[in-house]
């Protein structure tokens, strides 16, 4: 049986791993538009969270297994169509993640200086699409909209010293910009309260140990402490951190990270050379945030929206535009076509959540798909060669990996290559012309 998996992030690799266990003799091609594998492990997980990135060793073992190929630098739609893949493979799995930001939905969000978290995180993590992103850090104010871990990551990266980022794999171009940052007043804006936030304890706790930044919480935003006992353990730990922040006196640190709970963005205004985010105070009606009509403005140079992600539609695959993911019935889109991970369920859960997801899809393929003598990878190779597409393989990635590690500054695991041509040049085997 020949299976194509579109997307080389956690969902793609867990699905490939499961297919090897479920279907003897299966041949799996993991296809990605980037020259490099690992998806959000490489380009989404915060650069100062290296222990989380270590899961790529498991994926590398899958990529090196007999019957699995990584096929990078191939775009679905322009290099090969979905219809062609379905002709070549017995089953196709969409594991493309959710690479696009959800819109704030407020006037002025298209102004320069308003960024989505996918762009901002991609910028400091070395995603080639965002190597030239303009990140304005010349104003003291920065607003981060959202009450989840991505918002915490963004605030933490803005607040850390160069020394604190020294052991990370943050990119050189973003280090250079961050080192000149004038940001001193970071606002974390959430429309609901602490009990409704999606922060996890580890990420929250890190904010309390930054060299030059102090987290600030208005005690009035915290529910009565006796109510904490009814919370699930993780949320209770998070709220305990927030209570500690609220009780800590000012320490004279040059940067503050203010948690603006019960606050929602209304519009963005251009004021001279900077921005003003107009926000409305909210109140809770149950767990629903309701506007009070009380407005105020926060002056800033940068606004980063961290309110969720959407998958990218692919011609030939039914898409649920409202949910921002592929339309599917427990992973099945149509006969022989499946979705896994965020492409199936939307952006939820942890990296590990994708493992049972991938194993479930593999079990469905084993039960539902009959091998049809299709060409599989050999057919894809012939098609790409005829079109002049130079795909990367896992050996190419290993050369890129080695080049990045060799270029690392002291204390850092690697210096990422961030442009397609540099990645392709580094990945070429000796004697192979680069693009």
PLM feature segments, named:
Residues 11, 36, 150, 194:
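Conserved Rossmann-like nucleotide-cofactor binding loop
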Residues 34-91, 237-254, 258:
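N-terminal Rossmann-like dinucleotide/flavin-binding domain of flavoprotein oxidoreductases
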Residues 1-6, 10, 17-29, 44-46, ...:
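Rossmann-like nucleotide/phosphate-binding core characteristic of flavoprotein oxidoreductases
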Residues 23-39, 164-165, 169, 173-174, ...:
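Glycine-rich FAD pyrophosphate-binding loop
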Residues 59-114, 266-278:
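Feature captures the FAD/FMN-dependent oxidoreductase FAD-binding
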Residues 102-103, 124, 196, 313-314, ...:
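Glycine/Thr-rich phosphate-binding loops of Rossmann-like dinucleotide-binding domains
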Residues 156-290, 369-373:
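Dinucleotide-binding/catalytic capping subdomain of oxidoreductase cores
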Residues 101-180, 321-331:
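Glycine-rich dinucleotide-binding loop and its adjacent helix/turn
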């Amino acid at each position: 049986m020949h299976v194509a998996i579109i997307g080389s992030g956690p969902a793609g690799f867990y699905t490939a791993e499961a297919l090897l266990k479920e279907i003897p003799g299966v041949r799996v091609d993991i296809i990605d538009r980037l020259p490099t594998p690992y998806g959000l492990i490489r380009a989404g997980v915060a650069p100062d969270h290296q222990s989380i990135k270590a899961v790529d060793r498991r994926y590398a073992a899958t990529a090196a297994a007999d019957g699995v190929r990584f096929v990078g630098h191939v775009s679905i739609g322009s290099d090969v169509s979905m219809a062609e893949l379905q002709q070549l493979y017995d089953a196709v799995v969409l594991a493309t993640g959710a690479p696009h930001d959800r819109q704030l939905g407020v006037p002025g969000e298209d102004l320069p200086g308003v960024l989505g978290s996918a762009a901002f995180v991609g910028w400091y993590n070395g995603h080639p699409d965002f190597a030239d992103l303009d990140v304005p850090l010349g104003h003291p104010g920065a607003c981060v909209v959202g009450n989840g871990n991505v918002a915490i990551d963004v605030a933490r990266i803005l607040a850390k010293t160069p020394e604190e980022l020294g052991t990370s794999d943050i990119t050189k171009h973003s280090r250079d910009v961050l080192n000149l940052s004038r940001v001193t007043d970071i606002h974390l804006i959430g429309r609901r309260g602490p009990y409704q936030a999606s922060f996890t304890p580890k990420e929250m706790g890190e904010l309390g140990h930054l060299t030059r930044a102090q987290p600030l919480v208005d005690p009035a935003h915290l529910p009565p402490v006796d109510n904490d006992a009814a919370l699930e353990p993780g949320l209770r730990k998070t709220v305990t951190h927030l209570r500690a922040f609220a009780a800590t006196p000012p320490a004279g640190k040059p940067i503050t990270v203010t948690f603006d709970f019960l606050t929602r963005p209304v519009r963005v205004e251009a004021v001279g050379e900077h921005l003003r985010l107009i926000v409305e105070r909210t109140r809770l009606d149950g767990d629903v945030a309701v506007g009070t009509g009380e407005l105020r403005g926060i002056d800033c140079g940068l606004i980063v929206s961290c309110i969720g992600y959407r998958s990218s539609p692919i011609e030939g695959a039914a898409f649920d535009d409202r949910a921002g993911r592929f339309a599917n019935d427990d992973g099945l889109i149509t006969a022989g076509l499946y979705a896994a991970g965020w492409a199936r369920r939307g952006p939820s859960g942890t990296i590990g959540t994708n493992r049972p997801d991938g194993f479930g899809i593999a079990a469905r393929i084993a039960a539902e798909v009959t091998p049809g003598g299709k060409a599989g990878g050999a057919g894809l190779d012939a098609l790409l060669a005829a079109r002049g597409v130079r795909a990367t393989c896992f050996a190419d990635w290993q050369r890129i990996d080695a080049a990045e590690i060799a270029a690392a500054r002291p204390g850092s695991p690697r210096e990422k290559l961030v442009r397609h041509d540099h990645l392709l040049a580094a990945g070429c085997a000796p004697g192979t012309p680069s693009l």
